[in-house]
Structure formats: C-alpha cells, structure tokens
Amino acid sequence: MYTAEQKARIKWACRRGMLELDVVIMPFFEECFDSLTESEQDDFVALLESDDPDLFAWVMGHGRCENLGLAAMVDKIVAHNLSKVR
C-alpha cells in the first residue's frame, strides 16, 4: 500500500503536459486508485512514467501499449471515463 505522502506524489504525477490527459487521468486517480489492487496501483504508477504522446494515443485507442499490465490499466481508465458519460 502507498502512504499518504506517496499518494500525494502520485497525484502530482497525474498532472500531465496535456489537458486532455489531465481530464482523463486525474478523475480516475481520485475516484478509483484506493480501490485498485496493489498490483494495479503499481501498474498505474508505472503508466504515469509513459510519455504523454504515447499515453494519449493509448487512451484515444490509436495504439496499444505492449506491456499487458499497463494496457489493462489503460482499459480501466478508459472504461471509467466512458461510464461517466453514459
């Protein structure tokens, strides 16, 4: 599990260089991070180390991450955001 200080750092890392990513990633972190398994939390943190153009392409469905754990996390993020608009 992550400490409050670590979560604060993760939240800061959710702030991206692209507003489009901020709008997708930050709500997922705030609403879902604590309910993820430890392995999923690790995948989320690892995903934040990705370059913005790659992350944007994956979230928009214009490509697929080769790492299966990260790809599954992208799918969770996308599904969470789609559930909010339906």
From Swiss-Prot:
Pfam families: Sdh5
UniProt GO cellular component terms: cytoplasm
Main location (coarse class): cytoplasm
Keywords annotated in UniProt: Chaperone, Cytoplasm
InterPro entries per UniProt: SDH, SDH_sf, SdhE_FAD_assembly_factor
GO biological process: succinate metabolic process
Protein's cellular compartments: Cytoplasm
Family named by the database record: Belongs to the SdhE FAD assembly factor family.
Protein purpose: An FAD assembly protein, which accelerates covalent attachment of the cofactor into other proteins. Plays an essential role in the assembly of succinate dehydrogenase (SDH, respiratory complex II), an enzyme complex that is a component of both the tricarboxylic acid cycle and the electron transport chain, and which couples the oxidation of succinate to fumarate with the reduction of ubiquinone (coenzyme Q) to ubiquinol. Required for flavinylation (covalent attachment of FAD) of the flavoprotein subunit SdhA of SDH and other flavinylated proteins as well.
PANTHER family on file: FAD ASSEMBLY FACTOR SDHE
Name the record gives this protein: FAD assembly factor SdhE
Organism name: Vibrio cholerae serotype O1 (strain ATCC 39315 / El Tor Inaba N16961)
